[in-house]
Amino acid sequence: MKIEIGTIFPSHFKSSYPEEFELFSHFETTSGIPTAFFAVMGGLYQHTHTYANIQREACFGINFLPVSCYDRLINTIRGNEYEADEFQAGGFTVQDAKTIHAPMIQEAFINMECTLKDIQDLSGAGITAMVIGQVQHISVDEEYAQGYEKRYGKDGFMMLIPAPQDLKTGEPAQSAVATVNIERLD
């Protein structure tokens, strides 16, 4: 089951300090992601059908999956022809969004529903773009709804680390997939 949070401030949310929710969106504490009022995807390739879909539909979903789903995500890239069903290629379940008309991944521990705010050509040459969406709704899996344990660590947020170049030899390294760990509380 997922906990649903929309644009209306949840009355049961308590602030950590005075003015917290006057200064920051409640979406930041809902998702555990800084500035989650807006979702920014940098470096989205403009030749992809994802980019075309976002431009056409003026909305998009962001689905956060644990690193254990990485191989399934890679299957969606390998089966990425225009007519292909990427959900089926990855073995994911399609879930209807609450506020937009883009499909969501049911297995995601956090789903963010966004309306398109802006697109900027980062490359200046039609190669990559920064896509900015305004968050309309966030769904959080109940297991991830409390504390840090599930969101941060092996079952939480993951990110692709581009292959670093060896700065002495010039040799390329292999890309990596990382998870986020809490090192200390502030």
Features from the language model and the residues they span:
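Basic, polyanion-binding surface patches
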Residues: M1-D186
